[in-house]
Amino acid sequence: MAAAVDTFLFTSESVNEGHPDKLCDQISDAVLDACLAQDPESKVACETCTKTNLVMVFGEITTKANVDYEKIVRQTCRDIGFVSADVGLDADNCKVLVYIEQQSPDIAQGVHGHLSRRPEEIGAGDQGHMFGYATDETPELMPLSHVLATKLGARLTEVRKNGTCPWLRPDGKTQVTVEYYNENGAMVPIRVHTVLISTQHDETVTNDEIAADLKEHVIKPVIPEKYLDEKTIFHLNPSGRFVIGGPHGDAGLTGRKIIIDTYGGWGAHGGGAFSGKDPTKVDRSGAYIARQAAKSIVAAGLARRCIVQISYAIGVPEPLSVFVDTYGTGKIPDKEILKIVKETFDFRPGMIAINLDLLKGGSRYLKTAAYGHFGRDDADFTWETVKPLKWEKPQA
């Protein structure tokens, strides 16, 4: 590749599990998991908000499950590491408010006919449009800028919890800028331009120690050496002080980190959040199947990069539209790829739930609620399974 090649910079960010918005996502999904574990037909729309010494869960839940919401809130906070006021929240002594009502009967009869409908007849839980995206620039078929930002956040938590960096506290943010080359519509990462980490810390540590530890224990194990050079810029706790964090530092809300949850600013987003929603909510199940479709297209060699959009009307099972764009990287025309996608994937919400096994609780959704819903190597992330697509390579 010539040195004078045209490149551009693209940035993705992430936050780790102690960020107040992410804390809320995890509580909402922990509630969903608990409901589905006892009653797979649970209808859940659970929101969470938090501020100093307070967590509130609110929303609409119709379930046969017997769920202790307060216990789930405290356990989730505890597991993240919010065990005292000085780290941002005290799981055992904070105030927990619960305002949960039943799903509106108007919505219930329109979506699932009060549970009288067969799975293929279940309508979408709401209107909306969702996107799935995939790119061949990483083994996960995800954007590199997003993958690196996400892995830095996960690694920050790992070295906090295993004691490698005892000065760390739960809250933290990461951001990675990658220099790319556009190869006829496909994205080719050349180098990491900038790495930014802002992490909550205790009073004992100096900024120099923070920078040294982050380079050695967080950045080095995560970012492959081939992407770093002498020109790579590092901003490590650039504000100079981040002792107050978690809900004490900022208020948190479910559904405020939807780009971090998906593709780090690549592709597109229909605006609907994931956490705290059961699979009849197409904001979640639609985005999951759209990712599976896009990933399968790239994995099959049909394209190097791809976006899939689907849209729904409330109460209607079939999608209103399906759209595929391969950014000019398709081996066959996009309209032919679209035909293959429509033949291979069942976009009806009830069938998505069955085909991707989305009615299973446990800690399944809690796992998705931090460090991204896509590109994860975990059997519970069923939408990451590539479906084989039948197509003929065009004759040269």
UniProtKB/Swiss-Prot annotation:
One GO BP annotation is:
one-carbon metabolic process
> What GO cellular component is one of the record's annotations?
cytoplasm
InterPro entries per record:
ADOMET_SYNTHASE_CS, S-AdoMet_synt_C, S-AdoMet_synt_central, S-AdoMet_synt_N, S-AdoMet_synthetase, S-AdoMet_synthetase_sfam
Q: In which pathway does it act?
A: Amino-acid biosynthesis; S-adenosyl-L-methionine biosynthesis; S-adenosyl-L-methionine from L-methionine: step 1/1
Task: Give this protein's Gene Ontology molecular function annotations.
Answer: ATP binding; metal ion binding; methionine adenosyltransferase activity
Per UniProt, where does Mg(2+) bind? 13
In this chain, K(+) is annotated as bound at: 47
Relate the induction remark in this record. By salt stress, in stems and leaves (at protein level). Follow a circadian regulation with higher levels in the light.
State its cofactor.
Mn(2+); Mg(2+); Co(2+); K(+)
List positions binding ATP.
Answer: 19, 171-173, 239-242, 250, 256-257, 273, 277, 281
Annotated tissue distribution: Expressed in roots, stems and leaves (at protein level).
How would you classify this enzyme at the top EC level? transferase
Query: Which keywords accompany this UniProt record?
Result: ATP-binding, Cobalt, Cytoplasm, Magnesium, Metal-binding, Nucleotide-binding, One-carbon metabolism, Potassium, Transferase
Sum up the protein's function in the record's words. Catalyzes the formation of S-adenosylmethionine from methionine and ATP. The reaction comprises two steps that are both catalyzed by the same enzyme: formation of S-adenosylmethionine (AdoMet) and triphosphate, and subsequent hydrolysis of the triphosphate. May be involved in the synthesis of betain in response to abiotic stress such as high salinity.
Q: Which HAMAP family does the entry link to?
A: S_AdoMet_synth1
PANTHER family per the record? S-ADENOSYLMETHIONINE SYNTHETASE
Q: Which family does it belong to?
A: Belongs to the AdoMet synthase family.
| Subunit description | Homotetramer.
What protein am I looking at? S-adenosylmethionine synthase 1
Which species is this UniProt entry from? Atriplex nummularia
What gene codes for this chain?
A: SAMS1
